[in-house]
């Protein structure tokens, strides 16, 4: 059994330190601002867990200052776009770039920038934001054999998730407020047998250690309203009880050590995308369009 302490400490430090991001250029004003037009010293905060493997890698980051993560209404103008390079941390060689990421903030008080990069080798890398420090923020690409959570290209394992008809010992089956969400009508096992694409979210709106689970569920609910006939949408909680002291079986079945995670499969149950830690409805829609599922 995974303890709450192990589960929480296994997650990335959402409010932890990052690399200082310093520029002296004046803000350009409006939503057209870019990373080269920020005027104050900021930090890069990694918004991703250490489960990245070679291939197309998603690298979401946020910006912070000495007072914490920057929000949309915090008085600091946040760039609409960031530009970066990925470099080998040992040699300093640029391996990917330049790449850009748009700001995502739909339904979120703290926006993020989801970079995408094709990194084909195991190792330690840094993401260097234009206008930022020379050391950037670290990225570790792991050997897939060392990662136990389902990866893109692998089959999503069947699991009898709690439903409104059978909570399977999980109470409540959903901590979304003001009432349980509508994504608990079918088990993951049964959904995999339908031969339809699946969006499977594991996260807890009420007890999320990163503060992103409730917005993630709200984003998924928005998407499900449009695609409920062509895809199956399922939500599972992180904890067995509302006391948030016992990790739910759904978490152990996936070997998760962070939250939330959204697994998207094709009609054969193969994971074609996994969004970790932070995402909004716009990014989910973009992913589904890219995958040809919308």
At which residue positions do the language-model features occur?
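A short, hydrophobic beta-strand/beta-hairpin element that forms part of a small beta-sheet core
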Residues: 260-273
